[in-house]
Amino acid sequence: MTNYIKRFSILFFIVSSGLFANEGENLKDDIKNEESKDKEVFIEELVEDYEEIPGFFITYRDPKTNKIFLKINQNQLGKEFIYFAHVLDSVVTTGNVRGSYADKGIFKIEKDFENLRFTRVLTNYVFDEESPLKRSKGANTSDSTFKVIPIKGKNKEKNNFLIDITSLLLSESLTPILPIFSPEDFSPSRFAWGQVSPTKSRVLDVHNYEENTDFEVEYVIESAPSYEYDGEDAADPRNVSVHMRYSFIDMPNNDFEPRIENQSIGYFSDRITNLTSKEITPYEDLISKWHLKKQDPEAKFSKPVKPIVFWIENTTPLELRDYIKEGVLAWNIAFKEAGFIDAIEVKIQPDDAEWDAGDIRYNVLRWTSSPDPLFGGYGPRLSNPRTGEILGADIMLEWVYLTNRINYDSIFNAESSPASCHSSNLIQDGIILAENIQLNDPKIIEQSIKRLALHEVGHTLGLNHNFKGSYLHNNEDVHNPDITSKVGVTASVMEYPAINLAPLGVEQGDYYDTTPGPYDIWAIKYGYTPNLTASDLDEIIAEQNRPEHMFANDSEDMRSPGRGVDPRAMINDLTNDPITYAAQRIELINYNQANVVSKLSGNVKTFEEYRLALSIFMREYSRSLEVVSRHIGGVYVERYDPKNLNDKMPYSPAPPEEQRRAMGILHKHAFSTEAFPVNPDLLMRAQVERRMFDLYGEHEDPQIHKTILSIQNRVLDHVLSPWTLYRISDTELYGNDYSVNEVMNDLTKSIFTGDKDNKVSSIRRNLQTAYVRRLIDILGQDYYDELATAAAYNSLREIQKIVRRSSSDVSTKSHRKLVSWIIESGLDRAN
C-alpha cells in the first residue's frame, strides 16, 4: 500500500509539474505577444533610413540595397489606374528600340489578407447600365492577376500599406521583355535569347509627379555564346540591356467627350463590344483623340482651353527645325474645320531643360541616329482604354533616313508589319532616287521633312494609315503645283505614296504633300468637332461617298503578294491612274539608268555610289511593277453606311479592261525581251566598298540575273497566288470576264514568245524556267482550285509545243531541253 501511495504521489507530481510548466509557457507566450504588439514596427520606422520620393504613389528607395517600396493608401485600393510601358533604349534585335511603346492597360490593387494583389482589368466589354444583363458582367471572361506582394508594414491607423515592388519591376510581370516570335518566324539561324538576369537587372530611377509615378529599369538579358548574333550594336551579345520606363497613371476625371469609331474613317481605337446590344455589329470602339475644349463654347471658331503642345527635342538638327515646325503646325488647317484655332502649338526644348523626352507629360518630336533602325519615323500615342483620350505622344525620327546610308538586305524584302510605320523609309528612297536622276532641288528636302512631320504627327492625333489617299489627282494635275500646293499631292498625308517625280518631258511639280489633304481634314472634323449630336455625326459620315474621302488601312493594303483585294489600297503608287503613272516611272528609270554613269562621273567619292544608284533604280522598278500587278484579279471595296445613297456596290471587280491593260504593262516591262534594259557601264562600276573582312563568304559582284529574277518572281507571286486566282474565278460570277485561263494564257504568251531570232536571252531563260516550275507546283498543291489547275495544265501543254521549236543558239537549245524535261517529269509526278 505504501509503495502504491509513493508511486501515485510521484506520478501526480510529474503530471502536475508538466501542467504547471505548460501554464507557465503559455503565460510567457501571452507576455511575448503583448510585448510584440507594443513593439509593432510601423511604416514610419521601416522607412526612416530610406529616401522618400513624394508624388502620386509615395515611393521609397533603400539607399543600401536599391530596393523600391510603394506606400499604398486605403483609398487607392480597388481603384483603376492606367499602366503604360515604353522603351528608353535597347538594340534592334530585341524588338525594343528607343521610343517604342511596349504596353498599356488598366490595373487595380486589392488587399487580400496580408498581401496586395496587382490585377490587369479587361476593358473590352460593356453593358447598358439599365439592362438586367449587366448583373452577368464578368461571365466567361477573366481579369489577370500579374503579381501578389506581401505587406511589409502598416501605419498606426492601418490604412496605409508598405510593399516591396522590386521583384515586380525586375521581372517580366508587368510586360514581356524578351522577344516573342511566332512559329512562322522561327529560323534555326535566329539568335536564341536567354533570360532576364535578376541579379544584373536594376532599377535606375524613380520619377514622381502629381498624377503619375514612373520607374526606369534596366533589364539585362543573359544569353549563351552564339555565332548567330552578327550585329555591331552590342558590346557582348551574351549580356544585352533593355531600358524601360513604366508609368502608373491616375485615371483622368474630366468631361472628355468619347467618340465611337466609324469604319469609313481611320482612327486608332480601343476595342469595345456591347454585350447587351441586339445589333449585328455591337461595336462601340472608342477612337483615340486628344481632350480639346473651346475657350468660348458658343463661338464657331475658338482657341482651345489647353492646346496640344509638341516639343522639338534639342537633339534635332538646327537646319531641320523650321521645316518640322511648319509641318506640325500645318495640322491647324484641319483643326479649323473642327472649330479650333491654333489647336496645336510647337516649342523647342531648351538645351538646359531639366526634363527629358521620357517624361510622358511632354509630347516630343525626337531625333536619334542608330546603326540599324527598324523605322525612320514612328508616332505612337498613349490613350485611356476606358475613353480613348490620348494622354501623351512622342515621335521618333531617325537621322539615317535623310542620308544615303541604306540597308541593301531590305531592297527586295517589302514585307512589313502593320504595327510599324515606314513612311520615312519611302521618303529616304525618294530622296536618293531624286539625287540619282540629278534633281538638285532643295525643295525635295524641305517638302520631305514637312511631310514626314505631318505623317507622324497624324498618328499622334489618332489617325492610322490611309492607303487610298493616292487616288486624289489625275496624271496631269498631280504635276501642277498650283493645284497640289493647295490641296496636297494626295488626299491624305497618312498615305505611303511614291515620290512625285515628273515623267519624261513634263515639268517637275511638288514632290510631297506639305498640307493635310481633304481626307485628313474630314477625319479631324469627325473626331474633334465638339458637342456633336447623332444627326451631326451622320451628316459628317455621309461625306464618305466622296472620292477624295476613300479610305483603307494596313489590314486592307496589297503591298504583300496575295494579300488584300483592292488595288487602290496600295503603297508606292500615285494618281487615279496608277498603271500609267507606274509605267511612266519605269520609263524614267530606264532613261536615267542609261545615263547615270555620265551624270555621276567626276562627282563620286566611292564606287559604292554607283552600287546605291543601281539598287535604288531596281527597287523603284520593282515597286512600279508590283503596283501594276495588283490590278489583275482586283476587287474594288467600298465601305459606307447603306442609308447613304451610293451607286457603287461594296464589292465590284476591277474593270476587266484595266486588268488587261495591267497585263500589257507587265508584258512590256517585266517579261518581254524589252524588259530590264541593262547598262553594262553601271554594272562594272557598282562595287561594294570593302570594310575589313566583311566580304568574307560574300559574293560582292552585282548579281543582276538574281536581282531581276527576284523582281519577276515577286510579280508572279501575286498574279499566281491561289488567293488571286480564287478571286478571278469568283468575280466571274459578278462582272469580271478576265478569266483564269485568259490570265495564264497571257502570261505564257508574254514569257515564252517574242524572242528575237529564236534566241532566248539569259534573263528570259531564268524567267521561263521559274515560270514552268510554278505551273508544275500548281498541279501538285491542294490549295489551288480545279480551275487554276486546269489553266496551269493547259499552259504547260502549250509551252511543250513552243520549246520543241529548233534554234541554232546552243544556250537556247540546252534551255529548251531542260524546260521540256521539267514539264515531262513534273506531269509524271502530278499524276
Language model regions located:
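Bacterial N-terminal signal peptides that target proteins for export
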Residues: 1-9
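Sec-exported extracytoplasmic/periplasmic mature domains
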Residues: 329-340, 458-459, 463, 499, ...
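Hydrophobic h-region of N-terminal signal peptides that target proteins for export
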Residues: 12-21
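Auxiliary tRNA-acceptor-end handling modules of aminoacyl-tRNA synthetases
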Residues: 25-316, 334, 338, 349-440, ...
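Divalent metal-coordination and catalytic microenvironments
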Residues: 70, 331, 388, 455, ...
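The catalytic-center signature of Zn2+-dependent metalloproteases
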Residues: 348-370, 374, 447-503
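Conserved catalytic/binding loops enriched for acidic/polar residues
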Residues: 444, 470-831
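Extended catalytic-interface subdomain
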Residues: 389-407, 453, 457-458, 503-504, ...
